[in-house]
Amino acid sequence: MDESATSVLYEIRVRGLLGETLLSAFPGLRARALGTETVLTGPLRDQAALFGVLGLIEALGLELLEVRRTRP
């Protein structure tokens, strides 16, 4: 089965503008600056993958502002 068919698109917002080194920790996610925040967007295959990204955000000391599921 195509992974994109089973993945859910998420938008994850963190405080601060992430440099290339930090962004490289999130392969498969696109990043865009929005004011003084960074928005990471991309498909995650399941909640375990989402929790993995959230755990990495915590481990890197980033401040999580918002998580949104943007596609069913």
Q: Model-predicted segments: where are they?
A:
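Amphipathic, hydrophobic secondary-structure cores in small proteins
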Residues: 9-72
